[in-house]
Amino acid sequence: MKSLVLYSSLTGNTKKIAYTIYDEIQEEKDIKDVNELVDYGIDYENYDIVFLGYWVDKGICDKNSKQVLENIHNKKIALFGTMGASEKGSYGASIIEKIESIIPKDNEILGSFICQGKIAEGLKAKYKEMLKLSPDNEHIRQQLNNHEESQSHPDEQEIYEASMFAKNMMIKASIV
C-alpha cells in the first residue's frame, strides 16, 4: 500500500503533525507541502491512501488544502489538522464536519484528527483589535485566552495521538 501525506502549514504546527504521521507509515510513502506545489494536479493514481493536513482558517481548512481536497477522487482519505483554539467541544467537531462536507462523494473518508496548535503572535494582536470592535464576541475572547495555553502545542500527547491516528488509518485502509 502506498501513502501520500500532503500538508499545508502556516506556523509549523501542521507540518509537525504531518511528519509524525509520515514517520509512522511503514510502507511506501511520499510527503509534500501543498503550498510548494505549483500545480495542484497531483497524480493520485499511484496512492492507496491520502493523508491531508490543513490549518484552520475562519472555521474551515485553509484555501490551498480546500482546493486540493476538492480535486481528489476515488481515494481513501484521512484528514488531520491544527487549530489555534482547543479542539475539544463543538467548535472542533463543526470544523471537521465542514471539511468532510467539501470532499467529493466518490472518496472514502477513513477518519479525522485535529489538535490545538500554537497561535501565531500576529493573530494575538489581530484578535485584540477585533475584540475592541466586538467586545461581546465569545469566540474572539476564547482565542485570546487560549493564546498562552497554545504556546506548548502540539504537545507530546497530541504527537502521540497523531501517531496512533496514522497507525489506525493504515489498518483501516488495508481492511476496507
From Swiss-Prot:
GO molecular function: electron transfer activity; FMN binding; menaquinone-dependent protoporphyrinogen oxidase activity; oxidoreductase activity, acting on NAD(P)H
InterPro entries: BilS, Flavodoxin/NO_synth, Flavodoxin_CS, Flavoprotein-like_sf, Protoporphyrinogen_IX_DH
Pathway as given in its UniProt record: Porphyrin-containing compound metabolism; protoheme degradation
Family annotation (SUPFAM superfamilies): Flavoproteins
GO biological process entries: heme biosynthetic process
Taxonomy, superkingdom: Bacteria
Pfam entry (one): Flavodoxin_3
PANTHER family to which the protein is assigned, alphabetical: PROTOPORPHYRINOGEN IX DEHYDROGENASE [MENAQUINONE], PROTOPORPHYRINOGEN IX DEHYDROGENASE [QUINONE]
Protein function: Together with BilR, catalyzes reduction of mesobilirubin and/or bilirubin to urobilinogen, a key step during heme degradation. BilS is probably involved in electron transfer for the bilirubin reductase BilR.
Protein name (Swiss-Prot/TrEMBL): Flavodoxin-like domain-containing protein BilS
Organism: Clostridioides difficile (strain CD3)
